[in-house]
Amino acid sequence: AAGATTSEPADPRRRVGAANAAARVQPTRDGYMNAIQQYPWADGALYQVYTAPGQVTDIALQEGEQLVGPGPVAAGDTVRWIIGDTVSGSGAMARVHILVKPTRPDIATNLVINTDRRTYHVELSATSATYMASVSWTYPQDALIALRGANAAAASAAPVFAGIDLAALNFRYRITGDRAPWRPRR
């Protein structure tokens, strides 16, 4: 009916559960590049990562991104999960890797990773054998900013005068006087 609104569940736990379910991002076949699941970055998404005992899953952050704060990586269950971090590369190409490994199957926890650029929300699930070797992200907003910058640079490099017939220009003249650095060459 026109003007009708969808009512929310009265129980706030059901509202939270529904919001979390809507925010979950599952791995997709098209998202894989070799063994790396590449998720498109979105603020507030809950990225699903599947792990297995005896296997390390690498959560790779963006190049140049750095962990920040006194506890930049926090997990809900730090007893049954082994979580560490390392860095590959150096300088602007340095890349932080969060390494996770469950101690047993059929457990789950969440992981919050705070960096100088964003906060990642990850839900970890342990299976008996199936695991994701590596997870990383693509950053559509960063690509859009870079594209806008490239377009602005191209526009500023474009010729000032468009539509001039170069064949109609007259170069039969002579310039005399001092040789100033701004003096025309033709």
Where are these regions (language model features)?
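A general "mature secreted/periplasmic domain" signal
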Residues: A1-R186
